């Protein structure tokens, strides 16, 4: 089951975009296979251009994307989150994001990360200074809110599609029954006509 098969993705992405603007956090949705199914909202240069721009950094980021649950510290020292998207007990994807700091950073710690990833230290620190700072409590509340809203939305979309299919099937059934009734009436009329002719001939 894929979200794009039953959900209005324009509305889905509107929710994500508005949430990202309101909270200052980054977010993206992935399918059950881990591949992106939405745009990337509010992504920082620190993450998308520098950390993910290095081979080792990208490998570590993808590992966090796959394995991160709830609110957690990513390999580069930022706070990220991963919330499952579930329909009828089946995981159909995840919404991931964050890319914020829980406190003002220790530059030396991040210079060490830059060296490990083969990234220019000064550029890394310059990008780091543009990363938003949020308390873990507010990050957790924001992540849970997005997860709840998206889960409610996709479940409503799924129910609408399923109910629409049921109604469509019932309508088809009613139409078929009406057609059958009309055919029976027609055949009955033809039979009565034949019977009348037979009576006349019998006279």
PLM feature spans:
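Exposed alpha-helical structural elements
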Residues: 11, 59-60, 109, 123, ...
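Signal-transducing coiled-coil/dimerization helices and immediately adjacent hinge/linker segments
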Residues: 130-203
